[in-house]
Amino acid sequence: MIKSECFTRQWCEQVAQRLNYNDIQLIEKVVRALSLLEMLIKSGCPFHFKGGTATMLLLGGATNRLSIDIDIICPPGTEIERYLSDFKDFGFTKIDLVERKSPGKNIPKSHSKFFYQLAYTDRVSGEGYILLDVLYEDCHYQNTLEIPIVSPFIELDSEPLNVKVPSIGDILGDKLTAFAPNTTGIPYYKKEKVCSVEIIKQLYDIARLFDRVDNLEITAQSFRRIVTVEMAYRDIDNLEAVFDDILQTSILIATRGKEGVGQFDILQDGIKKIKSFIHTSNYHIDHAIVDSAKAAYISTCIRKGVTAVEKYPGTPEIVLDMSIAPALTGKLNKLKRIFPEAFYYWAKTSELLQDN
C-alpha cells in the first residue's frame, strides 16, 4: 500500500526535485490516482485497467508522461457503486454521484469524481479530484497480465498490489483506435471542450508502445476487435474510414497543416500543452512529427495485413535511397533531411499503400 507520507506536500516537493518537474499539483494527482487504483483492487471490483495511467505503469521508465485519471473496463451489469464505499480509507473526502450516461453514442460508461484535500495549499477549501471512467463491456484484449503498482511517484509500506492490464501489444491497438478524431477516436471537441491534449496523449503513447513491440500480430487483433465495437457505438460501418482518419491526421502533423484532413490548429495546441504532463524530457512539434509517422505506419501495416515490422535502425544514411511512393503526398519528401526517422516510416507506409 502507498505510504501515508506520499500524500503530503513535503513528499510531492521531494518528487518534484528528484524528477526535475515542478508541477506539484500534477504530482499529487498521480499519487491520488494510484491510491484510487489500490482502493478498487482491495474492494474486489472485477476490472481491467486501461488508458494512460495503465500505460504509465506498463512502460515504467520508457515513458515520461504523467497520467492522472483511472480508466477501467468492467463486465456488463457491474454495479460499480458497490466497490466505492471505502473511499475515505484511501484519502478521499467525498465522491460525486456515479453518473451513468451514453451521450448520443450508446456507449455504456459511468464517470465518478473522487475529491481530496490538496496537500500543496493551506486553504481549507483547497480541493482536487480524480476521475474514474468505467466502460461496461466484455474485455476485447488478446492477452492480459498482472503487474505491480510501482512508480517513482510513490513509496510502499508493504508488497505492491497487482493490477490486471492489457499487454503492450493490446494497449497499442486500443490507443490506435483513439487516435482517429473524426471517427472512433477522441474528437476535436466534446460539446464545447477542446480535446487537443487528449488527442496528442494518444499519439505520444502510441509511439512509445510501438518502441516496445517486435511485431503487430497482437496489436492488429486487439485493434480490429476494439475498433469494431467503437464503430458500432458511433454508427460507423466503414473500417477504411478509420484507417484513413489515422493516416490523414498523421499527415496533417507531418506537413504542419499543409496536407491531410483535420484541424491542425487544435493538434498544434495539444502538442504545446502536453509538455506540462511530461517530466525529465521535452516534447514539441519535431517529436510529434516522428510519432505521427509511427502511427501512420502501424495503422497501415494493420490495414494491409502486415504483422512484421521494419523499424528504423537509427542510421540516417538508410533513407538516402528511399523515397515517398505516389500513394502519398510528395510534401513528405521534405522530411528526409531533417527528420530521417519520420521519413523512413512514411516511405515504408507509402510502399505498403502503393503495393496494394
PLM region spans:
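A generic N-terminal leader/anchor concept
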Residues: 1-53
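Short histidine-centered catalytic/ligand-binding loop motif
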Residues: 19-22, 71-77, 192-193
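Metal-dependent nucleotidyltransferase catalytic core
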Residues: 73-108
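Catalytic cores of NTP-dependent nucleotidyl/adenyl transfer enzymes across multiple folds
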Residues: 4-5, 15-19, 30-34, 102-283, ...
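Active-site nucleotide-donor binding segment shared across nucleotidyl transfer reactions
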Residues: 38-70, 74-76
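Short, conserved acidic/polar surface loops in the N-terminal third of protein domains
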Residues: 59-62, 82-86, 143-146
